[in-house]
Each structure stands twice: as structure tokens, then as C-alpha cells.
């Protein structure tokens, strides 16, 4: 059966069978359409259609025989997909953990930065008050006439 399959259903033989009607058509045109050549051309065209149909039927038969193997393939494919989904879940979890960690670090750095900014403003305000109190003349603010001011 394999020999017949290789002989009649190979791409090489189909290519040769496809060229025969064209060659016979040229011969028919040169011989003014002999009935024998027309009959041979018809037989070859029918044989070609039969071979193509047979090849299709054999292909369908092979597919039907492989359905038992196909169930195993479906289970293997399902397991493979589930394995990939588990791996993906691990990667996504790691990604979210990394994002969460980065977010927490950023929040901590922001709060530290704000605290330092507040401290700097407070120290600046204290320094301004000290400078302002040092510049103030006690005689101008008290309204008292003391020996120091005179």
C-alpha cells in the first residue's frame, strides 16, 4: 500500500499527470482532434480526478485513525498550557511584588524628603526670628527711657 501511495500520490507523479493533458491537447491541435487522442485525454483527466479524490479520502481516513492519539495530544497540550499559566502567575506575582516594593520605597523616600523639607523650613524660620530679634533695638520697642538708651 505504501508503494502505491508513494507512486500514485506523490507530488512528482501528480505534477507529471498535470502535464499530460496539456501535451495531449497540443497533439490534438496538431492532428485535428483524433477521436482516440480525445478518448485518451478524457481517461487521463478522469484518472487525475480519481487520484486527487483518493488522496483526499486517504487523508481523512488517517485523520480519523489519529483521533485516539489526538485525545492524548489534547491532554498534553492542556497540561502544557496549565504549566505555562502557573509560570506566568509566578512571574506576574514577582512583578507586582517588585512594583509594590518600589512603591513603598518611593513613599518612604517621599515622606523622608517632606520631613527634611519641613525641618529645613522650621530651622530657617527659627534662624530668621533669631536674626530679627538680634537686629531689634530695645530702646525703640520698649518705649522706656533708660540710661542705656540715652
Swiss-Prot record:
Family: Belongs to the rotavirus NSP4 family.
A GO BP entry: viral process
Gene Ontology MF term list: channel activity; toxin activity
Biological source species: Rotavirus C (strain RVC/Pig/United States/Cowden/1980)
Residue stretches spanning the membrane: 16-30
Location(s), subcellular: Host rough endoplasmic reticulum membrane; Host membrane, Host caveola; Secreted
Self-association state and partner proteins as the record states: Homotetramer. Interacts with the immature particle in the viroplasm. Interacts with host CAV1, early and late in infection. Interacts with host integrin ITGA1/ITGB1 heterodimer. Interacts with host integrin ITGA2/ITGB1 heterodimer. Interaction with microtubules blocks trafficking to the Golgi apparatus.
Its membrane topology: Single-pass type III membrane protein
Name of the protein this chain belongs to: Non-structural glycoprotein 4
Keyword Magnesium assigned: no
Alphabetical UniProt keywords: Activation of host autophagy by virus, Enterotoxin, Glycoprotein, Host endoplasmic reticulum, Host membrane, Host-virus interaction, Ion channel, Ion transport, Membrane, Secreted, Signal-anchor, Toxin, Transmembrane, Transmembrane helix, Transport, Viral ion channel, Virulence
Post-translational modification: The N-glycosyl content is primarily Man(9)GlcNAc, with a small amount of Man(8)GlcNAc.
Cited function: Plays an essential role in the virus replication cycle by acting as a viroporin. Creates a pore in the host endoplasmic reticulum and as a consequence releases Ca(2+) in the cytoplasm of infected cell. In turn, high levels of cytoplasmic calcium trigger membrane trafficking and transport of viral ER-associated proteins to viroplasms, sites of viral genome replication and immature particle assembly.
